[in-house]
Amino acid sequence: MDLINSTDYLINASTLVRNSTQFLAPASKMIIALSLYISSIIGTITNGLYLWVLRFKMKQTVNTLLFFHLILSYFISTMILPFMATSQLQDNHWNFGTALCKVFNGTLSLGMFTSVFFLSAIGLDRYLLTLHPVWSQQHRTPRWASSIVLGVWISAAALSIPYLIFRETHHDRKGKVTCQNNYAVSTNWESKEMQASRQWIHVACFISRFLLGFLLPFFIIIFCYERVASKVKERSLFKSSKPFKVMMTAIISFFVCWMPYHIHQGLLLTTNQSLLLELTLILTVLTTSFNTIFSPTLYLFVGENFKKVFKKSILALFESTFSEDSSVERTQT
């Protein structure tokens, strides 16, 4: 989950204009803060449980390794949500210091990039397993998956560095402290000379985040699962329909949960403080909160007979969802 620009300042030709959160009604701020607190509590408990099961109760396979790190990215995001919620309740006042402001922003960005990259990696893994089974039998090992995991974390960390650098605390004339992006990295926040530079860097960050954090992963996921679905339909590779339903759940939840966020970030490039900006912020908080809490649970329950869910243990649900599909592995192209 990443709301790193929700408290930014927007630069126009003459002054520094506070973004949408200044114009949020108290009820809206309460909704956002409450959603963040609930997401943090429930997400920490459920994702912590899922991590424990995947790490200590299941055989270590490519599937369990990739899903472990996907859920770990959700877990990291939920741990820092209380800071955002507290800031919302205090009218965006930040009282945790500059260092934590930077860590907060960088961690949120890291959580966003790792989650979408691991979803893409899982899609690519299913593509290779289904359409290239011979290669998968020879090379698809937990050690190979560990290399993928390391590459994802390094890539996400590298892409998060700008959001660590640009994030600073700003003291206004009334003594209020805000944690926000200073794209020009200038101590003179209201310098007219730096406004153009700030705007261009802001646009560059938005474009790179949208392309690498949404558009490219979304196309990768769509391509991989479309090919997998075609092969499954053609040769009936899976013993049940659950793996396919998990794929569809991943695609839908990815789009629904992240599209509002990127729409809101695009609107932040304008100085038009409209109702649409306020609504997209609320929707972004709700959908990304849903993503960190319920996406792993959806993977477990999708395709299950609801009456049988409560008769299964958590471990049985995990094994039916994340275990390797031997029928695919035995199939030769």
From Swiss-Prot:
CDD domains: 7tmA_GPR33. Gene3D superfamilies: Rhodopsin 7-helix transmembrane proteins. It comes from the Eukaryota. The keyword Transcription regulation does not apply. GO terms for biological process: complement receptor mediated signaling pathway; inflammatory response; phospholipase C-activating G protein-coupled receptor signaling pathway; positive regulation of cytosolic calcium ion concentration. The keyword Transmembrane helix applies. GO terms for molecular function: complement receptor activity; G protein-coupled receptor activity. GO terms for cellular component: plasma membrane. Keywords: Cell membrane, Disulfide bond, G-protein coupled receptor, Glycoprotein, Membrane, Receptor, Transducer, Transmembrane, Transmembrane helix. Glycans are attached at N5, N12, N19, N272. It is found in: Cell membrane. InterPro entries: Formyl_rcpt-rel, GPCR_Rhodpsn, GPCR_Rhodpsn_7TM. Disulfide bonds join C101-C179. Belongs to the G-protein coupled receptor 1 family. Orphan receptor; could be a chemoattractant receptor. This is Probable G-protein coupled receptor 33. The lineage of its organism: Eukaryota, Metazoa, Chordata, Craniata, Vertebrata.
